[in-house]
């Protein structure tokens, strides 16, 4: 007759098998696990380096590095780390059309481990050269037939003045005024010419700065009769 073994009895051998892997992971020492970068407007790629040293007595192998975004990649100096040796992981970030704060993660996995041994953070700030709040305004039968206000702010480090506001004058009325609070550089007041026709219009706010720097922000205007 077979006897049922206690669950604790079964889990102890399994835990014992995992101990070497856990020990190896705990003996890896990182110079840093978080890097903050502020990109320049014309910069397309940012990079961050993370160095890991094997402080244990066993050789370990990095199996893979998983990134949290298609915009983020990784370059591994070497996969096998002998005791006392180190390797470097370089995180790469491609800006594309992104703006603002981008928090990307790189998860590092060792051989025969389902869980990441470390999560590396690459926090990238991309300057918003012309910021518009809100970027979308709309009217429908349930909303008031009054103007909508959009606050425009320039990043004065790069964009020093407005150059143009492009829109269809047959569809929209746009006026400009200073922000009485001083928080924004300009307030746009937008009103459709008519509320009885459907409008899907884009307003482009353009600015310029030193060394030929140019930027624009797009506003989306909707009227649903």
Ranges and model annotations:
Residues 1-4:
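Positively charged n-region of N-terminal signal peptides that target proteins for export
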Residues 18-58, 113-157, 209-225:
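Long, low-complexity ectodomains and other extracytoplasmic segments of secretory-pathway proteins
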Residues 161-225:
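Structured core of small recognition/catalytic domains
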Residues 9-20:
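Bacterial N-terminal signal peptides
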